[in-house]
């Protein structure tokens, strides 16, 4: 089997979710390192930390592909003053490349939000919110994306049954909600991560429920018996992103070793 360069893996990811799909504030794509080396393995994760770089070293991976960019804002210096800079230094010392697939992967057909919908068993998937039309720089073809995904359950379910389904599928102990709907739920709109900006779009699209990772206190008000709000946690909502990344790499770069990170990088703790 032929060797595969790191650049080929990153190119495959960016063909699937072109960088022009990302939000203007984002910093997806190559973050650290040189890409001409043969890939020894790809470690797939949500966040890059020093422990994740150590994991890549221990597993023989010279490429880390994260969902969230390690470098989100410009660095004024690279020293040891914070975890971002220390992580960059450690990666460079060990010839490890870091790339991120963030809002471009959220917005792509078959991306993060599609994976969430798949886990819930939704049918008739389509985008809601803003529709994005961009040109794929690699192919020159027009690509469609969107902010969130909406779909239907095969059979409607009660609000409390939806809560139980979310707890089971995303392995969470609790779900934050507004008042439970007294009607059945068939159509659900969703957005992994911080998706509260799409609540009004979900209502306009006719959704019975809206699922996301986080919302602020005041955003829950005023929607009683209008739409079922379900908030499961930012990290929890995006936990299956690594499966999306693995599927892309295994399809386009067969033979490349893919390792799903075993480190829980969720910075939020839950105590009971």
Feature names for model-found ranges:
Residues 1-272:
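Hydrophobic structural segments
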């Amino acid at each position: 089997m032929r060797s595969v360069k790191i650049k080929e893996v990153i190119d495959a990811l960016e063909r699937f979710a072109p960088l022009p799909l990302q939000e203007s504030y984002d910093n997806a794509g190559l973050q650290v390192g040189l890409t001409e080396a043969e890939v020894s393995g790809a470690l797939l994760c949500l966040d890059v930390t020093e422990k994740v770089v150590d994991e890549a070293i221990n597993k023989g991976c010279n490429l880390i592909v994260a969902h969230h960019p390690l470098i989100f804002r410009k660095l004024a210096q690279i020293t040891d003053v914070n975890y971002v800079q220390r992580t960059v230094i450690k990666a460079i010392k060990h010839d490890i490349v870091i790339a991120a697939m963030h809002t471009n992967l959220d917005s792509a057909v078959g991306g993060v939000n599609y994976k969430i919908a798949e886990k819930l068993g939704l049918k008739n998937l389509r985008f809601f919110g803003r529709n994005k039309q961009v040109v794929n720089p690699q192919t020159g073809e027009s690509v469609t994306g969107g902010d969130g995904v909406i779909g239907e359950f095969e059979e409607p379910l009660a609000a409390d049954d939806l809560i139980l389904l979310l707890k089971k599928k995303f392995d969470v102990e609790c779900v934050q909600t507004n008042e439970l709907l007294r009607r059945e739920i068939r159509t659900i709109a969703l957005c992994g991560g911080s998706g509260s900006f799409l609540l009004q779009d979900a209502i306009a699209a006719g959704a019975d429920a809206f699922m996301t990772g986080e919302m602020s206190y005041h955003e829950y008000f005023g929607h009683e018996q209008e739409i079922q709000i379900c908030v499961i946690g930012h990290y929890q909502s995006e936990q299956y992103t690594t499966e999306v990344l693995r599927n892309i790499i295994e399809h386009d770069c067969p033979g490349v070793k893919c390792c799903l990170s075993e480190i829980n990088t969720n910075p939020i703790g839950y105590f009971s």
